[in-house]
Every structure is written in C-alpha cells, then in structure tokens.
Amino acid sequence: MKKFFLTLAMMVAFMGVVNAQGRFEVKDMDNFKLHTYYTNDPMGDAAFIVETANGLVTIDAPLLKDNWEEFSNYARELHKHIDYNIINFHEGGDPKAATMRPEGMTKFMSEGMYDSMMKGFQQNFGDKMLDRPSGPSTEIKFGETLNSNGVTYKFEQAPAGGFPGATIIIGEKIRHTHSAPNEAHITGMSAPNAAAVDVAIDDLQKALASGCELFIGSHGGAVNKAVVENQLEYLQTVQRLLKQEKTADAFVAALKKAYPGKTGEDSLPQVAANLYK
C-alpha cells in the first residue's frame, strides 16, 4: 500500500492540474438511478450520485474545485436533498458537510501515508483543491447496512492490502470498490507481489457471487458483469503463467502472446519484476 501512495503522488506531481471537463453517465436501476461522474482529473477519479424519488446520496465526491463545481451543479439540477455524503476511499466534496465513512477510515485518513498523500496534493494543486473535510463524521461498522429512501448500502470490509475502506453493496444491484475492474493489463501498482494477484482473484469471484449487475470504482467508474468475468479469466491466466514460467522475461513474453494487443503492455516488465522478486 505504501508503494501505491508514493506512485500516485509522483504521477500527480508530473501530470499537473487538468481543468474540469468531466462527463456524467446515468444508469437506471429500476427503483433508483446511478449517476457516475468521470472527473478527468490527474488521478483518474470517479464520483457517484445515487438518486431515489426522494433524495440523493453521494459517494467519493470530487477533490478539485473545478470538478466539485461541475458535480455539485449537476446534483442541484436533480432538485433533491442530499441525505448522505459517503467518503469511502477518497476525500472530497463540501469540506463542512457531514459525512459517513467505513469504520476506521476517519483515523486512517488523518494520519500516516494517507495524510501525507493529501498534504502532497495540497502542495501540488494549491488553491485548485478543496479544503479537506472537517465536518462531523459518522462511521459505519463492517457488516452493517445504511438505508436511504428504500435503497440499502451494505458495508463489507475491503480486500486486504489496499485502502482499509469498504466494499459497499448498493440496493443489492451495485458493488462499489476502490477501483473498478478493467480490460487492461495489470500494473506494477496494482500487483506489488504475487499475493496481490491472489487477493484480486478472490475479490472478483466474490463480485460475481454477489448477484450485482453493475460494478463501480472510485477509479474506473462503472462496468458491467462481462468486464468482471474477463478480468477474472485474465488474472487466472497471470496466476497460471507465474507458476509455469521460470523467469520474468518468459512470463512477459507468454502473457503478451496470450493477450496480443491488450492495453498496458508497457507495464508488464514492472509487473514481472514485482512478481518474481
């Protein structure tokens, strides 16, 4: 996890600030709607609004002021009260608003590596970044369920090795994690060692067993079940080749052969170095 923080901070420092030109995507889940906001910020963040007939819930609202302006203006146009602001993995949103967080995240975000990362963002983004949240914070214990206007939010403990946030099952139809499954090769940041691949496979299997229709992440946005199935098959291939190939170079060659043209080949040497160390 320490490597994740360092890599993310370095990425942001080199990329600089991108002015907000985000986009929204809406999914109708019958008794509620999910609004996914792709920020186009340097971190590749996504933020979410769950809309019911009588209110709204935000999840991991944007960190940068331009994005927050787009996001909050959009929310106002829905003409409904925001009942809860959930901070799961990412700080952001109205700094003075009351927030709901998974157990332990209030402390985790205020000290150590997370706090250092946020202070680094403050130095890099300056006045383009919102103040950090200072409003009252209520924590939801793992295994407990929040109910808002008939939509349930079940908080389950996130996989080991990443942020100690929650996997949130929304309305028994949507599964929220830190990063959504995707179609690209894994990166050195997501696979710091072989155990991380095992953890990812286990979590994808849980995702498919959850009965959810949509899988969302504060990085990556919203994807369907087919993307989850494809990533599971891919990671099982990674796991098999890791046992089969004796060297890092042979592993990279075999993975490229198995998935010709797959996005992210440039990351494979670092992935192999991590997995074979």
Regions found by a protein language model. Give the residues of each.
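Sec-dependent N-terminal signal peptides
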Residues: 4-14
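Metallo-beta-lactamase
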Residues: 23-29, 63-64, 105-230, 237
